[in-house]
Amino acid sequence: MMRHDSGKVLSSILKYLLKLLFVCLLLGILYYSFKDSMEDMITELSKVSPQVILVLFLSVILYHLCEGHITWLIVHKTHPEYPRLKGFCNAFYCSFYKTATLGSGSGIAGIYYLNKAGIPVPNATGMYFFQYIVHKVSMAVYSLLLFLVTYRFIHTSFAYYQGYILLGFAGVCVIAGVLLAVATVPWMQTACNLLANHLRAKHPSWEEKLTGAGHKLAQLQAESRSLLKDPLLLLRLFLCNLLKFTTWYIIPWMVFCNSPGDGPGDLPFSFLQCFALTSLSQSLAGVIPTPAGIGSVEAVFTLLFRRLLPEAKALSAVLLYRFTTMLLPCAIGAFFVLGERIVSLHRKKRTAD
């Protein structure tokens, strides 16, 4: 038994190291591709004003307020005693573990902290996966709407990339559609069970994982059926997600407008066009399977914006965007995780006494 457990630990460590190696490789490729612009990029970053840093910090808080409210809306439907503050804290817990584990620990952390708040694990699993699916579908719809509104600008500026952009959008829509179908269409569970039985016959060692996946799918569909009965709740979730994405998508515009010598009138695009390009970068990066989106967001963002701006400006903006959407939430989340651990230890001591 101990040998089996140690094997699992070694396997998880190996997976993490492979992810880390893959991320380092991606970042190395990005550095090699843009090393000629590094000096100019560092100069651009050194000119960032304290006001911009404050705006970036506020955008992180607003994003997690929205994310926490989304969690609360979903959980509150069946567990009215769940407080809003727990949802806000849960958002930062997930952000910390998402970065610390390169993406794989976010879902586990979300389910774990929902369970600590009194939500049974099966329900917490279904709720978290439903929230993830709503997130993906909302992002795809928002990005598609912005793409259509600014289509003339995108067609004129990126005619060479248009085929790839449309192909990427098709991928985004397929992923969102499949996730939505898995969560809501009853026969999808039957199809997945048939596939699991086929795989189980070929690979008996997969029995435990396939059984666990089957249970999670059943929990997801049960929670989805319950939540889909409330159209007003779905509308609120969609609008909250749009507001949440907006707090991220305005970051490049703020950075570009506050660069020395640049103002809104000096840029080759309007606020809406910049907003749409950022949304497009984030959505298309989701099609590329990289840990926590590291490397893919940077590559797509830089590829699009460097056709309109000097490469150094595009690189400095994407670095600040990544800092705000990944590193800063992780740093703030670390304090939330530490605080939760301290509170848990105090509770255990009181119980022991």
Predicted regions mapped to residue ranges:
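Transmembrane helix-loop-helix hairpins in multi-pass inner-membrane proteins
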Residues: 1-43, 94-205, 290, 294-353
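Membrane-interface helix starts
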Residues: 13, 17, 47-56, 225-239
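Hydrophobic/aromatic residues in alpha-helical transmembrane segments
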Residues: 26, 66-74, 110, 248-255, ...
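Short, membrane-interfacial amphipathic segments enriched in basic
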Residues: 31, 202-220
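A short amphipathic helical element positioned immediately N-terminal to and/or at the very start
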Residues: 39-47, 216-229
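Hydrophobic alpha-helical transmembrane segments
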Residues: 53-57, 84, 88-89, 125, ...
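Membrane-embedded helical hairpins/re-entrant loop segments and their flanking transmembrane helices
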Residues: 66-96, 255-277
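Transmembrane helical segments that form the transport core of multi-pass membrane transport proteins
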Residues: 224, 228-281
